[in-house]
């Protein structure tokens, strides 16, 4: 590194970061990413994006009113705007029944928004089975990731569907853990 320290000082005048402005900006970075999500802007005003496929585990935490729900909605909307249902499927788990229900009829969903702890646990068990199935498919095709698998089936003209990414969003994870306990914890540990 450098022998320097960077200190961020809050701006006297705040600027609004428009989700629309960033999502409509057709930067080449979007095309390079499997699952691009909008984070915001950096101090120079450049759009900050994240490839969720390269960040398979993401925890959003903060105090009440800090903007966690806004952040989660930005992540989901980024996926909806930039990737088709054939490319990305979603499982949305909302034990408090208030935050994610508005997404109930979107084509990206593998199942309607889940609000019951038992169904949440079952959906994560499905993910575990699907993960094992996909490992087997990748192994059989001699590849290591979804991109290579999808490319290989096209190259070999194999009549099978491409594998979409699956993104699981759990709102209020602590509440879900409190109601389901150790079983859920071990399932999530295996998925991780």
Q: For each predicted feature, which ranges?
A:
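Hydrophobic positions on the alpha1 helix immediately C-terminal to the Walker A/P-loop
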Residues: 71, 75
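P-loop NTPase motor-domain active sites and their immediate coupling elements
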Residues: 2-37, 41-43, 47-49, 54-55, ...
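Conserved lysine of the Walker
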Residues: 68
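Short hydrophobic/aromatic beta-strand immediately N-terminal to the Walker A/P-loop
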Residues: 58-59
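The conserved Walker
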Residues: 64-65
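P-loop NTPase switch/communication element
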Residues: 53, 80-125
């Amino acid at each position: 590194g450098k022998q320097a320290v960077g200190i961020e000082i809050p701006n006297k005048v705040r600027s609004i970061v428009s989700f629309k402005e960033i999502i409509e900006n057709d930067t080449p970075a979007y095309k390079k990413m499997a699952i691009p999500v909008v984070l915001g802007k950096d101090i120079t005003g450049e759009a900050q994006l994240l490839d969720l496929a390269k960040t398979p585990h993401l925890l959003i935490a903060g105090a009440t009113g800090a903007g966690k729900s806004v952040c989660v909605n930005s992540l989901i909307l980024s996926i909806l705007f930039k990737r088709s249902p054939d490319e990305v499927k979603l499982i949305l788990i909302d034990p408090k029944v208030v935050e994610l229900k508005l997404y109930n009829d979107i084509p990206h969903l593998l199942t309607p928004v889940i609000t019951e702890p038992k169904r949440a646990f079952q959906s994560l068990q499905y993910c575990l089975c699907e993960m094992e199935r996909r490992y087997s498919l990748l192994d059989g095709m001699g590849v290591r990731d979804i991109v290579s698998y999808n490319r290989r089936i096209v190259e070999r003209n194999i009549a099978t569907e491409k594998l979409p990414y699956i993104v699981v969003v759990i709102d209020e994870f602590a509440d879900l853990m409190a109601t389901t306990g150790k079983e859920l914890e071990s399932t999530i540990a295996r998925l991780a």
